[in-house]
Regions:
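PLP-dependent enzyme catalytic core of the Aspartate aminotransferase-like
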Residues: 8, 353, 357-386
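A glycine-/small-polar-enriched, mobile loop at the entrance of the PLP active site in fold-type I
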Residues: 23-80, 84
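Active-site C-terminal subdomain of aminotransferase-like
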Residues: 33-34, 210-301, 305
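Conserved beta-loop-alpha segment that forms the PLP phosphate-binding cup at the N-terminus of a helix
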Residues: 72-102, 106, 110-114
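Active-site phosphate-binding strand-loop segment of PLP-dependent enzymes
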Residues: 134-191, 204, 212
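Conserved active-site segment immediately N-terminal to the catalytic lysine
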Residues: 198-210
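Conserved PLP-binding catalytic core of the aspartate aminotransferase-like
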Residues: 309-342
Length: 386
């Protein structure tokens, strides 16, 4: 049934009215289902973004983010913008005109990293891997050997477009051996698989709230190492974005009671993020990772029993984002449309060169549970005629 937010008045004019969305089961690549507890936090009374109580919430949110990132980095914040802005913030702060940056691409989002490097006036050296494979550390080593002036390595930990995990620990260690900093995309990995910022030595790490954290979209958790902060503070050129300039943002998220006004933070969205991080802390990171993996294995077993094939080898699969090969003769859009309209179930289409070839089934955060696994399998059996 199509819902409309418009009605026709007596004089024939269109009138808007309140929007009441249906209750979907969100099993795509994000956003994921948001719990009633987080939605309840979102609806609490708004207070000022410099209110002493809100400052306390900011400090506690920072500590919770340090917990999930496994870091002691002082500059750990939820950027007041979505994950794509987190990506841009990492690049505009750490990349200067004329720099050489090694960018790993094994899916859509590595390509977006390249765009950011070039918009900063720097040179992107591309390390290409097949979409569906992890980043090959040997290729990265060869890129550093060919470009010894490279001062930054950028890669995606969990490639959202393909459902592939890359070996972030090895890649960060490789960059350190070449005196290069790292920018790491963890939009899909944070909260779903292990992420050890300090142990791995990652320098600028960004994520999103709408995936394994099961919060509303619109914020980008970020963390910067002391080495990254030093590079930001010692730049020879001004950061090209005022809003994303971490030297200014640090004044608002700093560790003292005198906060410098930079922008009006999305107060209620931060209530929601704080609540979602509390839920994750209560469960425990290891328990969250185990839950995601158990539900992933159950889903894969059911899909393979239907004759469907997974697109990624088991070692590198993301438990929170399952890439499934679309059977020959099956119309991608028709299947997804029927799932949505007959079962209120959303799964994702393939992106880029994988459009029409793969489905992406998310088991992220609050949505990663046995009930959703069985509902998804039942719906697919019905739609595919199994």
């Amino acid at each position: 049934m199509r819902l409309s937010i418009f009605s026709i008045s007596r004089n024939g004019q269109a009138m808007s009215h309140s929007f009441h969305p249906p209750q979907r089961i969100l099993m795509g690549p994000g956003p994921s289902d948001v719990s009633a507890r987080v939605l309840g936090a979102l609806g609490r009374p708004t207070i000022g973004h410099l209110d002493p109580l809100f400052i306390e919430l900011m400090d506690d949110t920072k500590q919770l983010l340090q917990y999930v990132f496994k870091t002691q980095n002082e500059l750990t914040i939820p950027l007041s913008a979505p994950g794509s802005a987190g990506m841009e913030a990492a690049f505009v702060n750490l990349v200067s005109p004329g720099d050489t940056v090694i960018v790993c691409q094994n899916g859509v989002f590595g390509g977006r990293m390249k765009e950011n490097v070039e918009r900063c006036g720097a040179h992107a050296v591309m390390v290409q891997d097949r979409w569906g494979d992890p980043v090959d550390p040997q290729k990265v080593e060869e890129a550093f050997a060919a470009h010894p002036d490279a001062n930054l390595l950028a890669f995606v930990h969990a490639e959202t477009s393909t459902g592939v995990r890359s070996d972030a620990k090895t890649l960060c260690e490789l960059a350190q051996r070449h005196d290069a900093l790292t920018i790491v995309d963890t939009v899909t990995s944070l909260g779903g698989i292990d992420l050890c910022v300090d142990d791995w030595g990652a320098d600028a790490v960004y994520s999103g709230t709408q995936k394994c954290l099961s919060c509303v979209p619109g914020l980008s958790p970020m963390t910067f190492s002391p080495k990254a902060v030093s590079r930001i503070q010692n730049r020879a050129t001004k950061i090209q974005s005022w809003f994303l300039d971490m030297q200014l943002v640090m004044g608002y998220w700093g560790g003292n009671s005198k906060r410098a006004y930079h922008h009006t933070a999305p107060v209620n969205a931060l209530y929601a993020l704080h609540e979602s991080l509390l839920i994750l802390q209560e469960e425990g990171l290891d328990a969250s990772f185990a839950r995601h993996r158990a539900n992933h294995l159950e889903l894969v077993s059911g899909l393979e029993a239907m004759g469907l094939s997974m697109a990624v080898t088991p070692e590198w699969r993301l438990p929170q984002l399952n890439a499934v090969c679309i059977p020959d003769g099956t119309d991608d859009a028709t299947v997804r449309s029927r799932l949505l309209h007959e079962f209120n179930l959303e799964i994702g289409a393939g992106l880029g060169e994988l459009a029409g070839k793969q489905w992406r089934i998310g088991l992220m955060g609050h949505a990663s549970n046995p009930v959703n696994v069985q509902q998804c399998l039942t719906a697919l059996r019905h739609v595919l005629g199994h």
